[in-house]
Amino acid sequence: MYQDLIRSELNEAAEVLNKFLSDDHNIAQIEAAAKMIADSFKQDGKVLSCGNGGSHCDAMHFAEELTGRYRDNRPGYAGIAISDPSHLSCVSNDFGYDFVFSRYVEAVGRKGDVLFGLSTSGNSGNILKAIEAAKAKGMKTVALTGKDGGKMAGLADVEIRVPHFGYADRIQEVHIKIIHIIIQLIEKEME
């Protein structure tokens, strides 16, 4: 009954991934992000990750696989998703939602750390403010974006952009693949 819809959805997902994969710049950016993060870990730095909605879940997934594990056992890496409900609700109430991530970066971020921000539109105000705060602290920044990069285009030290202009879930599907590859590369760099 729904087999054509299922095939159509899977084919569209494959097309978005293949378009991303066909641009060598994307591959180089993934490698650059992994090396940047591994270099931070080698200097006792950490990664702070953030996103909204499904991208927030991806930010938590990224941090969890850094502190826990990806495929194989190894020492944990310092990854923190900015996801504490009391922090998010306090800052949202007292300062506004645009400041939920930047306030955390200001409090916890240090020179040599990395901010890992996800925004499928590239226009999330709270991620933009987090990038600004990270740069002010001397941190490196990685942004996973979509579409044309939005307001984040060119702001991060490394931007990995999925150039899809349809629904955000297609961008998120590629983002999670990027996250897994970055973790795999970090593990190789840390051996």
UniProtKB/Swiss-Prot annotation:
Biological function: Catalyzes the isomerization of sedoheptulose 7-phosphate in D-glycero-D-manno-heptose 7-phosphate.
Domain of life: Bacteria
Domain SIS stretches: 37-191
A single BP term in Gene Ontology: D-glycero-D-manno-heptose 7-phosphate biosynthetic process
Top EC class of this enzyme: isomerase
UniProt cross-references to Gene3D superfamilies, sorted A to Z: Glucose-6-phosphate isomerase like protein, domain 1 (3.40.50.10490)
Source lineage: Bacteria, Pseudomonadati, Pseudomonadota, Gammaproteobacteria, Vibrionales
The name this protein goes by in its record: Phosphoheptose isomerase
Pfam assignment, any one: SIS_2
Subunit structure: Homotetramer.
Keywords: Carbohydrate metabolism, Cytoplasm, Isomerase, Lipopolysaccharide biosynthesis, Metal-binding, Zinc
Additional free-text comment from the UniProt record: The reaction produces a racemic mixture of D-glycero-alpha-D-manno-heptose 7-phosphate and D-glycero-beta-D-manno-heptose 7-phosphate.
